[in-house]
């Protein structure tokens, strides 16, 4: 699920829905969610010309998929959105026999995603991760002291803390299906709840801190927290670690940390899937098989700092990534992780209404 600087790949262009079916491939993925040379290497190996476009929310992707004729051959929705899209006929089944490297997949991770989607032929998990809080150690300590609750959602969701952090900048993901369930866990409700009153309570809690937020955006926080322009953010795990790495590389004095709150958080899976009306299906399979190669999967993990669905890639993944509990949680930490359910139409309307009211500041 995941963001940052837009990378200019060879072949980046507008999609017009009339791409030639031979020798081309149109991919739509989250921004900053692939190693810098992966596309160029695939093109060099296969001769297939790739058009690689990026989005910053599942809602944007879903709108294109449900409208039809998107022109894309491969997309990477989060599992719950893939489930909804499949119900609407927006995606086709994936024939795993056409993907030899599918055998590299972590069967446990894939099984969790398959249960969420409701099918074992919807697609293959690309990356998985959590939602938590990233923060600037020094800037937060200056305002909240050494006993700042850097293990809890209260760091941001408690209005008293948010007020003290307002001057250094707080940001929240523009991702209602990730944020609202976690606010519910902070309030003591199950993150898997679909009770209207629980969503309303979560919306009220967010509205209480709305005056102290710098912005609600999913693609801006990586650079801003790395540069010290904000000091705390609700972020996806890999984005937070990319920010920490960028700050370290820049030697700018900002130390960024990330944690999974002790109240619990959601576990999500991003899945490579083929739209129902894809024109370049053969090339989509070739690309998925390439992405499932152990060496390619490891290179992508080492760049984006998200956990991989590829078990065979583990030996080539940076040990720092493998050992970080914010990326690969311990078994104890996993006990507090939950998978957001696929919302029905009524619940989805509640989520949209609550989120719009909060984001508008009403």
Predicted region positions:
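Sec/Tat signal peptide C-region and signal peptidase I cleavage site
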Residues: 15-21
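Early extracytoplasmic/lumenal segment of secretory-pathway proteins
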Residues: 22-85
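Paired acidic/hydrophobic, glycine-rich loop segments that form the ligand-binding mouth/hinge
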Residues: 73-76, 214, 231-236
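Extracytoplasmic ligand-binding site segments that recognize negatively charged/polar headgroups
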Residues: 76, 82, 86-212, 219, ...
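A ligand-binding cleft/hinge motif common to bilobed small-molecule-binding domains
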Residues: 81-84, 232-253
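Periplasmic-binding protein-like
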Residues: 199-208, 214, 252-273
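Conserved C-terminal helix/tail region of periplasmic/extracytoplasmic solute-binding proteins
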Residues: 223, 331-362
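Mature extracytoplasmic/periplasmic domains
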Residues: 270, 275-336
């Amino acid at each position: 699920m995941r963001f940052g600087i837009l990378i200019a790949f060879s072949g980046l262009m507008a999609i017009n829905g009339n791409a030639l079916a031979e020798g081309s491939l149109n991919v739509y993925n989250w921004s900053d969610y692939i190693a810098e040379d992966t596309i160029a290497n695939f093109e060099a190996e296969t001769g297939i010309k790739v058009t690689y476009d990026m989005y910053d929310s599942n809602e944007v992707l879903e709108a294109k998929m449900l409208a039809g004729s998107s022109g894309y051959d491969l997309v990477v929705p989060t599992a719950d959105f893939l489930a909804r899209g499949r119900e609407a006929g927006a995606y086709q089944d994936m024939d795993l026999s056409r993907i030899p490297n599918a055998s590299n997949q972590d069967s446990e991770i894939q099984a969790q995603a398959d249960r969420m989607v409701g099918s074992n032929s919807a697609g293959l998990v690309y990356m998985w991760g959590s939602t938590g809080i990233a923060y600037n150690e020094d800037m937060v300590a200056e305002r909240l002291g050494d006993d700042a609750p850097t293990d809890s959602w209260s760091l941001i969701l408690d209005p008293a803390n948010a007020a003290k952090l307002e001057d250094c900048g707080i940001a929240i993901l523009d991702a209602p299906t990730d944020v609202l369930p976690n606010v519910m866990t902070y309030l003591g409700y199950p993150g898997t709840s679909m009770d209207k009153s629980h969503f309303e309570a979560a919306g009220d809690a967010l509205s209480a801190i709305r005056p102290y937020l710098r912005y609600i955006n999913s693609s801006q926080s990586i650079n801003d927290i790395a540069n010290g322009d904000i000091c705390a953010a609700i972020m996806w795990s890999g984005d937070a670690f990319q920010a920490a790495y960028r700050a370290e590389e820049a030697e700018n004095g900002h130390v960024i940390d990330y944690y999974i709150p002790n109240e619990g958080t959601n576990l999500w899976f991003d899945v490579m899937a083929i739209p129902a009306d894809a024109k370049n299906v053969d090339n989509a399979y070739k690309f998925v098989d390439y992405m499932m190669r152990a060496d390619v999967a490891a290179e992508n993990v080492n760049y984006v700092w998200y956990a991989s669905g590829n078990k065979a890639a583990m030996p080539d993944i940076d040990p720092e990534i493998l050992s970080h509990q914010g990326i690969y949680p311990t078994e104890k930490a996993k006990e507090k992780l939950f998978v957001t359910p696929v919302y029905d139409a009524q619940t989805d309307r509640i989520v949209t209404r609550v989120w719009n009211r909060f984001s508008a500041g009403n």
